[in-house]
């Protein structure tokens, strides 16, 4: 499957988002569970990194379901590490997947260091509570069902900032299938619009290694 992400033109991204907004309302609630089942698991982009070592580093990525955390929707804990430095987890955060329309709410951890590596420990994750999180309302991702994947795109306008005073905003878009997660996460200068971090060679292409990381849920 060939998927192309990431127009550099803000107007193109805005037009694409408006199209998604119109179509997302028709998304079935059953897609919430399908999307969550596809997302859950352990991923690696090792094949991509070996093929293009100049542009991509090998990364291990986890999405672990949090059945206890939210009264609505489905929660996930996600984090990753560079496979050259295994165990040094970063970008630990929490997602809330909601229906009607299908979307993702992003949360940062108030104490990032305290939860680094928690994707490997279910008992530890069971202690995670809403008081440990800070909602990032500007970082909502709208998800649209397409013929062979789910496509996600962050709200346009540069509103996703980890801290109110940040001069850089985050833009994320992705395509998800049952076996592949293709994501392009980038930072942009809020004044100039120039990219400040993230891949400049296209999205990271993660292959699912283990469909469900831990034993089946009760």
Swiss-Prot record:
Family label: Belongs to the CpcT/CpeT biliprotein lyase family.
CDD domains: CpcT
EC numbers for this chain: 4.-.-.-
InterPro entries listed in its UniProt record: CpcT/CpeT, CpcT/CpeT_sf
Top-tier EC class: lyase
Segments passing through the bilayer: none
Keywords attached to this entry: Lyase
Domain of life: Bacteria
GO MF, one example: lyase activity
The protein, known as: Chromophore lyase CpcT/CpeT 1
Keyword Lyase: yes
Stated role: Covalently attaches a chromophore to Cys residue(s) of phycobiliproteins.
Organism encoding this protein: Synechococcus sp. (strain JA-3-3Ab) (Cyanobacteria bacterium Yellowstone A-Prime)
UniProt-listed PANTHER family: CHROMOPHORE LYASE CRL, CHLOROPLASTIC (PTHR35137:SF1)
Gene assigned in the entry: cpcT1
């Amino acid at each position: 499957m060939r998927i192309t992400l990431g127009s550099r033109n803000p107007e193109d991204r805005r037009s694409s988002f408006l199209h998604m907004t119109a179509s997302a309302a028709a998304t079935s609630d059953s897609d919430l569970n399908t999307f969550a089942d596809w997302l859950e698991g352990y991923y690696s982009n090792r094949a991509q990194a070996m093929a293009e070592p100049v542009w991509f580093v090998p990364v291990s990525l986890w999405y672990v379901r949090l059945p206890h955390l939210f009264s609505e929707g489905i929660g996930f804990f996600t984090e990753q590490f560079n496979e050259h430095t295994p165990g040094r987890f970063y970008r630990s955060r929490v997602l809330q997947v909601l229906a009607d329309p299908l979307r993702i709410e992003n949360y940062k951890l108030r104490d990032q260091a305290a939860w680094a590596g928690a994707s490997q420990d279910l008992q530890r994750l069971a202690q995670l509570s809403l008081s440990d999180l800070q909602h990032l309302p500007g970082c909502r991702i709208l998800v649209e069902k397409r013929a062979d994947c789910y496509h996600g795109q962050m709200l346009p306008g540069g509103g996703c900032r980890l801290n109110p005073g940040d001069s850089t905003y985050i833009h994320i878009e992705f395509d998800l299938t049952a076996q592949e997660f293709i994501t392009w996460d980038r930072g942009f200068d809020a004044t100039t619009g120039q990219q400040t971090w993230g891949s400049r060679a296209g999205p990271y292409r993660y292959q699912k290694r283990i469909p469900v990381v831990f034993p089946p849920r009760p």
